[in-house]
């Protein structure tokens, strides 16, 4: 808490200061207390998925697993009896993890997942519709290979944006293969993670953004598989 407190001698000092952290400050001479409003939103360490819903009356499949062989009653047949997330937060509210959901309103909805051992289950989002953006947080270090059940994020035809945190060390075979509508892939890792085969194939030839300081390292990295996508690699703006 002490790191979030700042003392000023005058109101002028407070007005001139830039506070971009959660802060409570006070001015000794004027006996004033200020509550700074520039506190950033804490970064979520698990998987964040943005779903865009046109028809709130339709029950959709959020992810694969936890239902019967068809994923429960939904408009998608891509369910299955795989592992459930450990926790699930729907639009800021903690909910019991379940793979089908009926949103009450149209528009964008945010669902956040955490997993046992911070491991994304195999084929977790394979063929899932309505998902437009994915953010993989710092608690997750690997994206699994595809297996007989499918790819972790394969064939998500409405997906336009993927952001992968700087903690990632391995991106598995076929991880995003078949996401034909992708517009951007952002990888924040300053050390190129090992890349599985066909991980970014069939992804609309979209740009792959990496930290500016390591663009050349990514482009020239044959041992980790990144050189295959060298023409698409650009610096994060």
Give the residues covered by each predicted segment.
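Extracellular ectodomain segments of secreted/surface proteins
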Residues: 42-82, 117-140
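Extracellular/surface-exposed low-complexity repeats and stalk/linker segments enriched in Gly/Pro
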Residues: 1-24, 32, 184-197
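Short, solvent-exposed S/T- and G/P-enriched segments that are highly enriched in secreted/extracellular
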Residues: 92-102
